[in-house]
């Protein structure tokens, strides 16, 4: 992997998004919570997948994760929805609307004409398991 010159496309808080030689790499970047997703994460995933979908130079999209967890050194692909971000009536985004939009991420993954490969390096639980199959 050291020979790959990944270029950061855009800075995000919950994910990393890089490209190199026709390959896009989108990775969960919340290892402290086993890469659980929250509304902000799904918005960032939608932005990154949409960009990779529209970029004609990209043929392959890798979905992966950063890690390990600083708490115990364990790697996790994704542990699903972040239960700490879940309110009384479900997930609430920064704008106050109740939504998680992970189904939109799944739809974009399934219908993009690009090859999407899940690089599952660790636990994949709940909604995280649904993303890699």
PLM region spans:
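Conserved CoA-thioester-binding segment of acyl-CoA-metabolizing enzymes
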Residues: 1-68
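Charged catalytic carboxylate motif
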Residues: 40, 44, 101, 108
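Glycine- (often His-adjacent) and acidic-residue-rich active-site loop
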Residues: 65-107
């Amino acid at each position: 992997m050291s020979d790959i010159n990944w270029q950061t496309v855009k800075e995000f808080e919950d994910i990393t998004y890089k490209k190199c030689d026709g390959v896009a790499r989108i990775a969960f970047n919340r290892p402290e919570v086993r890469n659980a997703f929250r509304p902000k994460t799904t918005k960032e995933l939608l932005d990154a997948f949409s960009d990779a979908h529209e970029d004609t130079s990209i043929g392959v999209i890798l979905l992966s994760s950063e890690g390990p967890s600083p708490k115990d050194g364990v790697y996790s692909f994704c542990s699903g929805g972040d239960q700490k971000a879940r309110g009384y009536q479900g997930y609430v985004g920064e704008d106050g609307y109740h939504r998680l939009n992970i189904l939109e991420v799944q739809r974009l993954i399934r219908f993009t004409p690009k090859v999407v490969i899940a690089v599952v390096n660790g636990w994949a639980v709940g909604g995280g398991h649904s993303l890699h199959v």
